[in-house]
């Protein structure tokens, strides 16, 4: 039986619509608390579980925080409140403080009217599927509030921001500083607005912060990693050396250089791998996704680095890294994983890794990416009849085979069905845009004819 509420990145939706309602979130807190309290060894030790709750800057965060806190308390679980805190900050603090679990109230890069709940285990990793399944099972049980002397207690973690700032700084080499660098830091009016500027300033940079005036409604609105034009303009206007774009919960990173050129997660992954090769002499492998640009795969293989594609989603990149014992992975959207630095994607830490790579090499981003030109992509969404058997179509298979044969070694074809609507996504990459367009349109035409 599939999970009813948990997706690949927790539970998410529009506030006020199921399941993102205060009554459901209260029951979710209670269910999670009961699962934590029943963990092996917990009852025998007599120790009360403690969870950390952090959130981004959405107006609904206060309501959902109160609901979660009430649910955990009713289950006899103590709560520590971090206030606005990046998702990776909650993961770090949960691990560092030896807590039972961490919870983030955020919908990441989504608009303010959405929100979500994401859990971290005691080691700062996302919850295993089996624990999420146990929480869902508890949601069906009646809420049996603990007796008054068994209720969980709640308190603020007053030094949460300071602890996380120091952790981020600790990932930057002690031999380097950022003196003499002018950085524009875009916090997306989100969870990092209180911490990110301080991290770079305390390392010596001249910081120009933007997206640091949250009002509950403006998170990700025209700023941040999902809207980098604001950062590109600010970098040029302020003659900055570099621009750093985070998203609403600060687990994504995009970078802008002094010319206003934008670098995505695919390109930054290549930069970090090349830096590791220069530092350590070898990188066994790196992980991208089905959407990672083919040019990056080619460049990494030419550098002697194995490259594996995971399903789309940082959760799947992480799974592949752990399975292979590798350190570096990324999505083009800016989720960058460096498992020797953090257990999860962290936009601030990733920015510091990029800055350290530039310091070590003495090069600009453009210079580090010389010879790597992203292949043009053509994406066509083809609407089909619900239930259409596109996989069984010989005409579609022939169109795909023809494109793959023509592009052999110089491009690729990716066909993906949408998980939410009867749409087939046809994506073709090639060295020349004309080739990408021609092959994508040929496949799309075959799909239309076969599924009409």
From Swiss-Prot:
Protein name, UniProt field: Phosphoglucosamine mutase
Required cofactor names: Mg(2+)
Family to which the UniProt record says this protein belongs: Belongs to the phosphohexose mutase family.
Cross-referenced PROSITE patterns: PGM_PMM
PANTHER family given in the database record: PHOSPHOGLUCOMUTASE (ALPHA-D-GLUCOSE-1,6-BISPHOSPHATE-DEPENDENT), PHOSPHOHEXOSE MUTASE
Example of a GO biological process term: UDP-N-acetylglucosamine biosynthetic process
Post-translational modification: Activated by phosphorylation.
EC number from the UniProt entry: 5.4.2.10
Annotated positions of the Phosphoserine modification: 108
Keywords of the record: Isomerase, Magnesium, Metal-binding, Phosphoprotein
Catalytic residues identified in the record: 108 (phosphoserine intermediate)
Taxon lineage: Bacteria, Pseudomonadati, Pseudomonadota, Betaproteobacteria, Burkholderiales
Domain of life: Bacteria
The protein's role, per its UniProt record: Catalyzes the conversion of glucosamine-6-phosphate to glucosamine-1-phosphate.
Reactions listed under catalytic activity: alpha-D-glucosamine 1-phosphate = D-glucosamine 6-phosphate
Family matches, as InterPro entries: A-D-PHexomutase_a/b/a-I, A-D-PHexomutase_a/b/a-I/II/III, A-D-PHexomutase_a/b/a-II, A-D-PHexomutase_a/b/a-III, A-D-PHexomutase_C, A-D-PHexomutase_C_sf, A-D-PHexomutase_CS, Alpha-D-phosphohexomutase_SF
A GO CC annotation given for this chain: cytosol
Cofactor note (record): Binds 1 Mg(2+) ion per subunit.
């Amino acid at each position: 039986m599939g999970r009813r509420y948990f997706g690949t990145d927790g539970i998410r939706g529009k506030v006020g619509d199921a399941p993102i309602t205060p009554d459901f979130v209260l029951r979710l807190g209670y269910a999670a608390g009961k699962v934590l309290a029943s963990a092996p060894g917990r009852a025998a030790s007599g120790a009360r579980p403690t969870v950390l709750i952090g959130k981004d800057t959405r107006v609904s965060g206060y309501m959902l925080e109160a609901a979660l806190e009430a649910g955990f308390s009713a289950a006899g679980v103590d709560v520590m409140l971090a206030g606005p805190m990046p998702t990776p900050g909650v993961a770090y603090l949960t691990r560092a403080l030896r807590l039972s679990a961490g919870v983030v109230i955020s919908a990441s890069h989504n608009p303010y009217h959405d929100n979500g709940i994401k859990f971290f285990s005691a080691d700062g990793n996302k919850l295993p599927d089996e624990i999420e399944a146990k929480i869902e099972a508890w949601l069906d049980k009646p809420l049996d509030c603990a007796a008054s002397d068994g209720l969980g207690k709640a308190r603020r973690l007053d030094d949460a921001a300071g602890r996380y700032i120091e952790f981020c700084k600790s990932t930057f080499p002690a031999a380097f500083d950022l003196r003499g660098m002018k950085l524009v830091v875009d916090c997306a009016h989100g969870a990092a607005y209180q911490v990110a500027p301080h991290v770079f300033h305390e390392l010596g940079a001249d910081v120009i912060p933007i997206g640091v005036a949250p009002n509950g409604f403006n998170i990700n609105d025209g700023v941040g990693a999902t809207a980098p034009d604001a950062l590109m303009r600010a970098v040029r206007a302020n003659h900055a050396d570099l621009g750093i774009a985070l998203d609403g919960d600060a687990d994504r990173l995009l970078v802008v250089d002094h010319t206003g050129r934008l670098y995505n997660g695919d390109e930054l992954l290549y930069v970090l791998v090349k830096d590791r090769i220069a530092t350590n002499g070898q990188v066994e492998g790196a992980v991208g996704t089905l959407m990672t640009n083919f040019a990056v795969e080619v460049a990494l293989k030419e550098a002697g680095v194995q490259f594996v594609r995971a399903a789309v989603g940082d959760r799947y990149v992480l799974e592949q890294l752990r399975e292979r014992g590798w350190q570096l992975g990324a999505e083009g959207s800016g989720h960058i994983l460096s498992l020797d630095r953090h257990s999860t994607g962290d936009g601030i830490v990733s920015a510091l890794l990029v800055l350290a790579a530039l310091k070590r090499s003495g090069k600009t981003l453009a210079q580090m990416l010389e010879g790597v030109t992203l292949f043009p992509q053509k994406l066509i969404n083809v609407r089909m009849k619900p239930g259409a058997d596109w996989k069984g179509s010989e005409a579609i298979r022939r169109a795909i085979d023809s494109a793959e044969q023509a592009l052999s070694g110089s491009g690729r074809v990716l066909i993906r069905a949408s998980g939410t609507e009867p749409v087939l996504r046809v994506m073709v990459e090639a060295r020349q845009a004309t080739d990408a367009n021609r092959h994508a349109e040929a496949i799309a035409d075959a799909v239309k004819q076969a599924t009409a």
